From Swiss-Prot:
GO terms for molecular function: diaminopimelate epimerase activity. It is found in: Cytoplasm. It comes from Geobacillus thermodenitrificans (strain NG80-2). Pfam families: DAP_epimerase (PF01678). Its main location: cytoplasm. The keyword Cytoplasm applies. This is Diaminopimelate epimerase. Catalyzes the stereoinversion of LL-2,6-diaminopimelate (L,L-DAP) to meso-diaminopimelate (meso-DAP), a precursor of L-lysine and an essential component of the bacterial peptidoglycan. The record marks 168, 217 as: Could be important to modulate the pK values of the two catalytic cysteine residues. PROSITE patterns: DAP_EPIMERASE. Belongs to the diaminopimelate epimerase family. The lineage of its organism: Bacteria, Bacillati, Bacillota, Bacilli, Bacillales. The gene is dapF. Keywords: Amino-acid biosynthesis, Cytoplasm, Isomerase, Lysine biosynthesis.
């Protein structure tokens, strides 16, 4: 058994346990099991996974993310906002605009501060990756996947696929409250046409500036919010002519709202809140709670 300090934070209800590796040390081989342990609502803390705030050779800070099933992810928009808040409020960075390293590359964060507290964060998520090979999805490597027919479980759907450093597939629905998140989501997540799995998004278009959104996250299942997924939904909606490029779009997630723009410079920018829930000491007992 050993213990470590943690902070629980959330972005629109998408909650993770954050461990500051500027101050703590965790064995690399234990990280998947620790993620499963802290995520458990009965024997752990309860969260969508584990995020490590790490030193970096490329930026002031690095983010590593482990899903609730122990798998390591490449990117997390809500996690990035929380990492930015933590890094600024704990003195890891002093500038209000700074880089964060992720497994999918460097991203720029800009914090809005009131009375020393970060109240919102804007993340430059970079350019979406649209080639089929970059998502990745099987089929002609150079093609985009826009309004493509997709057969599964004996039914035909229309999908658009986007990578924001992690894979997303978007289904449009007429009523977000009736979206088959828990039935279609897990089936599509593990479909062989997505060799690395995929995050599954359901989107209802309200107007050119407003979307309703629900998500089945790869490795975590239903979550309250997914920042990269909301970005992918806006990109997909522009590609399908449902929203406009360079216009702020409000995305209503189960946990709250994000404002997202796919700019004419090619970059996707996301603005939203980040909240600290609690801090404490976690006692990790290996197999007993991992």
């Amino acid at each position: 058994m050993y213990s470590f300090l943690f902070t629980k934070m959330h972005g629109l209800g998408n909650s993770y346990i954050y461990v500051d590796l500027f101050r703590e040390t965790l064995p690399e081989e234990d990280l998947p099991a620790i993620a499963r342990s802290v995520a458990d609502v009965h024997t752990g803390i309860g969260s969508d996974g584990l995020i490590l705030i790490c030193p970096s050779e490329q930026a002031p800070v690095k983010m590593r993310i482990f899903n609730s099933d122990g798998s390591e992810g490449k990117n997390c928009g809500n996690g990035l906002r929380c990492v930015a808040k933590y890094a600024y409020e704990h003195g890891i960075v002093r500038d209000r605009s700074f880089l964060i390293e992720t497994l999918s590359g460097l991203v720029e964060a800009e914090v809005t501060v009131e009375n020393g507290e970060v109240t919102s964060v804007t993340i430059d998520m970079g350019e979406p990756r649209l080639r089929r090979s970059a998502i990745p999805m099987t089929g002609p490597e150079a093609e985009q996947v826009v309004a493509e027919s997709f057969a599964i479980d004996g039914r035909e759907y229309e999908i658009t696929a986007v990578s924001m450093g992690n894979p997303h597939v978007i289904f449009y629905v007429d009523d977000i409250e009736k979206a088959p998140v828990t039935t279609l989501g897990p089936v599509v997540e593990k479909d062989a046409r997505f060799p690395e799995g995929v995050n599954v998004e359901f989107v209802e278009v309200v107007s050119e500036r407003e979307l309703h959104f629900r998500v089945w996250e790869r490795g975590s299942g239903v979550t309250q919010a997914c920042g990269t997924g909301a970005c992918a939904a806006v990109v997909a909606s522009v590609l399908n002519g449902k929203t406009a490029r360079g216009v702020e779009t409000v995305v209503h997630l189960a946990g709250g709202d994000l404002t997202i723009t796919w700019g004419h410079d090619g970059k996707v920018r996301m603005t939203g809140p980040a909240e600290t829930v609690c801090t404490g000491v976690y006692y990790y007992r290996g197999g007993q709670n991992g």
